[in-house]
């Protein structure tokens, strides 16, 4: 815990030296596992929220945490065959919707 606080202080000091200041503090919570840990501001999330998650790969810990903690409807996207196969083997809640498509700068293949 002390290490995390030290990192925050050093990060804030570095930003201040660059001329960046914090105008407002927000409530932050981190969820996920391995390389998929993401920080969110949960204040406006509810069971009526819809989340779109892109490039899920084989790590849906963050996605499942959003459903578990906030009851959101979550749409996960990843076109890679490995991810499609892996997701197909998982037991996911009904609020989790997987789409085997991705984002690109153009339409088509």
Please describe what each predicted stretch is:
Residues 1-109:
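Phosphate/nucleotide-binding beta-alpha loop and adjacent structural elements of enzyme active sites
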